[in-house]
Amino acid sequence: MSKQIVHSDQCRKKIIEGINVVANAVGITLGPKGRCVAIEQSYGPPKITKDGVSVAKAIQLKDKSLNVGAQFVISVASKTADVAGDGTTTATVIADAAVRELNKAEVAGIDIQEVRKGAEKAVEAVIADVRKNSSPVKNEEEIAQVATVSSNGDREIGEKIANAMKQVGQEGVITVEDSKNFNFEVEVVKGMRFDRGYISQYFATNREKMITEFENPYILLLDQKVSTVQPLVPVLEAVAHTGKPLVLIADDVDGEALTALILNNLKGSIKVVAVKAPGFGDRKKEMLEDIAILTNGEVITEQLGIKLEKVNDTSKLGTANRVIVTKDHTTIVHDKNNSDIEKKVNSRCEQIREAIKDTTSDYEKEKLQERLAKLRNGVAVLKVGGATEVEQKERKDRVEDALHATRAAVEEGIVPGGGVALFYASRVLDSLKFDNEDQRVGINIIKKVLEAPVRQIVKNAGGKEDVVVNELSKSNDKNRGFDARTMQYVDMIKAGIVDPTKVVRTALQDAFSVASLVIATSAMITDHEEDNNTNRSGGGVGGGHHGGMGGMDF
């Protein structure tokens, strides 16, 4: 396939244009009066959302050169979502503004390397000021406020998330799932979460969110590494005959075994996900046993004379109502009352409490307390309902955003919302030292760019951007901001309009990182459009292979 190369000014122009296309689509969702975006799905009704990263990821531009720019800003939205869980729209708006302003400086003939140095100094100073003015989350009401703002002003969502955190603790496990009715409910169920995710991204069942979700799976617990597939064949065939999915938790899975599991998963012969066991050494064995008790299964270990190749039915496998696996975490959920499991869990908790009393190591005590909390506290499930499937999915997106924002707030605290935290933090730049005039240009660019979130929120509310920015510029109160819901100037903290510090910080860092890369780019290589058209007319890959799922491949 031949390539086309675009250089210098034309390259930058195309990239900036592509960034602007995505930023315009994402930016309209910002703030309480931001608009929803309808995203066409490959099947079923369109997805209606205000989630910035969902909007960004749905964009694929026909013009290859423009699409390179689009991918830049999609990457900033994705990175912000991965780190902070929220703030993707703010990051996109800032990145768009920063790229345009930095490009103006280069076009004007200013030394762009010095401009970038000045801008980098400015970003560091602003982030330090934001952190300095951050306040810790003190109570349930502040948690509800963060969740309410992040969910587009939905107070019910804020209160439900605060209630869930109250029941399982601020560091407890909270999941989101569809309700089977119209209601929005909080339910605390048996379950646990540990810090290990899938071994390969090819196990993800939801490619948009990159997670694996299984209903009523079997759980195979192995105290060993698996490299060859043959020992797994009997148990895989037994599970495949039931039609249920399988969660494999082992020391490690690699080589031929991993390849075979991925192949059969993609083929549809068996739904499976492989996860590394949590912990290390003896602690790993204890945690596997914790999971076994919770799921009513057994740990397959040769130390007890149980060989993997001899497991040819599901009797030694655990079960769960639901398992959710991300690249970093695995959550096991039960919502069925089982008195036998309850007794075993209580007995296990008592054993751990005794071990806590006996140990003299602070580190060991901390790890035992973590295990106890995982077994005892359970999992809070936010069950989201809606009158229609479209309404339910839209609300579920907002609940997930709000939950991420709340976690970020618990982690690093909160600052005044509505874009004013960055707006007022930019004042530290007035006294920031610089080495030359070109660096001063970079500092001033960041100062201007930090108005972008406030301007976008006001614009989406139908207000006058310049009037609001001018009014806030006169204020000596760093909590004073513009409430886009009421179109009034208020004390943002007292009004409950707050943002997680981590979200604000991450949005600025990621936006500037991408803007710097764009300005450093002077050429791009893309496929020729004619080649793409030729390929599309040439038929499908593989020339017409047909057939059913068949058996498993080993």
From Swiss-Prot:
Positions of ATP binding: 29-32, 50, 86-90, 418, 499
GO molecular function: ATP binding; ATP-dependent protein folding chaperone; isomerase activity; unfolded protein binding
Domain of life: Bacteria
Biased composition (Gly residues): 537-554
Gene3D superfamilies per UniProt: GroEL (3.50.7.10), GroEL-like equatorial domain (1.10.560.10), TCP-1-like chaperonin intermediate domain (3.30.260.10)
Region span, Disordered: 528-554
Catalyzed reactions: ATP + H2O + a folded polypeptide = ADP + phosphate + an unfolded polypeptide
Subunit structure: Forms a cylinder of 14 subunits composed of two heptameric rings stacked back-to-back. Interacts with the co-chaperonin GroES.
Protein role: Together with its co-chaperonin GroES, plays an essential role in assisting protein folding. The GroEL-GroES system forms a nano-cage that allows encapsulation of the non-native substrate proteins and provides a physical environment optimized to promote and accelerate protein folding.
HAMAP family xref list: CH60 (MF_00600)
PANTHER family: 60 KDA HEAT SHOCK PROTEIN, MITOCHONDRIAL
Family that this chain belongs to: Belongs to the chaperonin (HSP60) family.
UniProt protein name: Chaperonin GroEL
Source lineage: Bacteria, Pseudomonadati, Pseudomonadota, Alphaproteobacteria, Rickettsiales
Gene field: groEL
